[in-house]
């Protein structure tokens, strides 16, 4: 099905595909159409939404347009896409209460104009990521502010 959509959008199919299932709170990694691994994830506490400031996880086709965090230790905390020099367990109790962005950032860009690209529905401009979390115990249940959270 996604191949038809890609063709309609004038995009090329990729050998690697990440399929987020919000209902099941799972992220599946496919290679050449075959499932390699299924990961537990957490999407937004809010209903799915592509609209800015909704804090909902966007739907539709996306691409990973930026990878941040290569070489950083597991649990490294990022603020503004920059490592702060501390892993989550080293942060204050107050800071650890927040959903921190940890380990890596895969920044997403929508591929569907008017759905998740452009105007008030632009995933890239909303800074929606796939990233690690300091609250791994919540994986499998909606708990983010729009991003897809995964284990470190």
Where are the regions that the model predicts?
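N-terminal pre-domains immediately preceding structured catalytic cores
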Residues: 1-129, 133-152
């Amino acid at each position: 099905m996604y191949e038809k959509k890609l063709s309609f959008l004038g995009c090329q199919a990729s050998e690697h595909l990440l399929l987020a299932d919000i209902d099941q709170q799972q992220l599946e990694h496919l290679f050449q159409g075959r499932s390699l691994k299924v990961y537990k994830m957490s999407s937004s506490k809010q209903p799915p939404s592509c609209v800015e400031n909704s804090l909902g996880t966007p739907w539709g086709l996306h691409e990973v347009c930026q990878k941040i965090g290569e070489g950083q230790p597991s649990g490294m905390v990022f603020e503004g896409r920059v490592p702060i020099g501390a892993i989550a367990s080293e942060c204050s109790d107050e800071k650890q209460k927040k959903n921190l962005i940890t380990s890596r950032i895969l920044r997403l860009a929508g591929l569907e104009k008017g759905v998740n690209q452009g105007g008030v529905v632009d995933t890239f401009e909303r800074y929606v990521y796939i990233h690690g979390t300091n609250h791994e115990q919540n994986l499998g249940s909606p708990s983010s502010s729009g991003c897809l959270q995964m284990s470190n």
